[in-house]
Amino acid sequence: MAIKKFKPTTPSRRFMTVSAFDEITRREPEKSLLAPLKKTGGRNSYGRVTVRHRGGGHKRRYRIIDFKRDKDGVPARVASIEYDPNRSARIALLHYVDGEKRYILAPNKLQVGDTVKSGEDAEIKPGNALKLKNIPVGTIIHNIELKPGKGGQLARAAGTMAQILAKEGKYAHIKLPSGEVRLISLECKATIGQVGNIDHENISIGKAGRKRWLGKRPHVRGVAMNPVDHPHGGGEGRTSTGRHPVTPWGKRTLGKKTRKRKASDKYIIRSRRARKR
């Protein structure tokens, strides 16, 4: 994937970069795999803001993605590589030999005309999905299940990948994009390869309005607010917080640990916050 730069015709244009979309082969999505997507503006069913800094943005339609890869033993041809406004990765349209069509996350180097397959007899090549017990140690993977049959949940963003470090008993040791090493059942499925659109991390948004196109509203600092709006607010002129940093609701933040102990902690071999050597 190439990144496109612009001539500095305006101050915001100077630093803005976009994807060249060289890998995109089809402009219109497959209609049978679309669903309506209603915007919430960060509000819950009571109309109260539960997630701040959301609202607006360009209208989207949801692309139904096959994260489960449960159509085992049936080969499919990659018909097109498409843009998906709901995620950073590209998506690939598959045409199965029995006539069914599905979208999957497009792995790096997957091209139109390639054949992909899922199941125990699938080859170890990008785009194929197998259970972890059938994937060799050291293989790069993505779209990893946490529970067998639930569908991939880990390593789905553009350019992300995980690696199988070892297999022990009923579990595989998986190194995740964050650096965390975690035990995952060998019965869980994963897709071979790295997620495509690997240059996504190098894109510069360039201006505030482009964030608004994405449905993201301004993130205002507490010290820039009035006292009625935030515990850090108020004061004459520019002032410090005057206290330990807190959330808008008065809870300690910036250093205060809030993560509760979970039953799944026993599956974490190495924390993502462990010092990297």
Swiss-Prot record:
Gene3D superfamilies: 2.30.30.30, Nucleic acid-binding proteins (2.40.50.140), Ribosomal protein L2, domain 3 (4.10.950.10). It holds the Pfam family Ribosomal_L2_C. This is Large ribosomal subunit protein uL2. Residues 253-277 have a biased composition (Basic residues). The lineage of its organism: Bacteria, Bacillati, Bacillota, Clostridia, Halanaerobiales. Keywords: Ribonucleoprotein, Ribosomal protein, RNA-binding, rRNA-binding. InterPro entries: NA-bd_OB-fold, Rib_uL2_dom2, Ribosomal_uL2, Ribosomal_uL2_bac/org-type, Ribosomal_uL2_C, Ribosomal_uL2_CS, Ribosomal_uL2_dom3, Ribosomal_uL2_RNA-bd_dom. Belongs to the universal ribosomal protein uL2 family. It comes from Halothermothrix orenii (strain H 168 / OCM 544 / DSM 9562). One of the primary rRNA binding proteins. Required for association of the 30S and 50S subunits to form the 70S ribosome, for tRNA binding and peptide bond formation. It has been suggested to have peptidyltransferase activity; this is somewhat controversial. Makes several contacts with the 16S rRNA in the 70S ribosome. Residues 223-277 are annotated as: Disordered. One of its GO terms (molecular function) is structural constituent of ribosome.
